[in-house]
């Protein structure tokens, strides 16, 4: 379980050994696919279990998408993070509210819930939306002598569009600007414990490494990544992946970044109209053109005072609505309500 086990230094200077897991984390549901992962879903499930009271965790089995076993001694809840066409959720297809194995289906966005309703006909009466949450990024000053663009999610979600667009914009526009424009890439599949999936993207990673103004960093633990976001100005995300929510976008908004992304899947709902969205298109070249226009505008505007004021409002909104302190109260109220209904 990465980044959860604590390390205790032995007083005799022997090999460090893992500390015992906190009680709340002993009941976190894991499976063969996510045991070594620390992506957005894992950040959410560990974050939830760290914050919920032990007495509630003893009464509820909270399963993030992939059902392996159902505990007969606890009330089962299915916390769905994936898409409606994922094979892991096929068992929900046309199951009536009466036959559903779970006391509640918990979704992370209304877009996602509607997809499950349209494709699998899940019962609205058993469904609830509980948006994702983050720990707000603290107030900070950004570098004033450079413009830093960041991409900090897995490569299959849009890196193949971003790199050639940045190369083109740098050659045609950025190289002539007063401030240098740099792209920082934090991306690979090691975050999920799937290094073998990096292979199709190695050529793209090499292009990043070879460009003087693109900096390929691999991946970082989430806490270190959030510190790096404080140095960034723009989140560039030409998303081609149907996000059910997006932790990377939430953390970028909390860090006060001007976010440029496609209006695809749950991204408009997640962004709540604070970002620079552009219409999605299936055409790869047209997508690059739309993204390039928007990214160039973002770079040209990011230093203007009205943009800084808007980003300050964006940060306050994100830190309020998507704050774990708020979300955990909603989770507790929901669970306590289910207990009341079960009595």
Language-model-detected regions and their locations in the chain:
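N-terminal pre-catalytic "stem/leader" segment of glycosyltransferase-like enzymes
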Residues: 1-70
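A charged, aromatic-enriched C-terminal amphipathic alpha-helix characteristic of glycosyltransferases
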Residues: 38-43, 282, 286, 306-339
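Active-site proximal beta-strand in glycosyltransferases
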Residues: 60-89, 103-107, 128-130
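Donor nucleotide-sugar binding/catalytic pocket of nucleotide-sugar-dependent glycosyltransferases
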Residues: 102-117, 122-139
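Conserved donor-binding/catalytic core segment of Leloir-type glycosyltransferases
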Residues: 141-158, 163-166, 184
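Nucleotide-activated donor-binding/catalytic signature segment of Leloir-type glycosyltransferases, i.e.
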Residues: 197-223
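Acidic donor-binding loop of glycosyltransferase active sites
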Residues: 230-244, 257
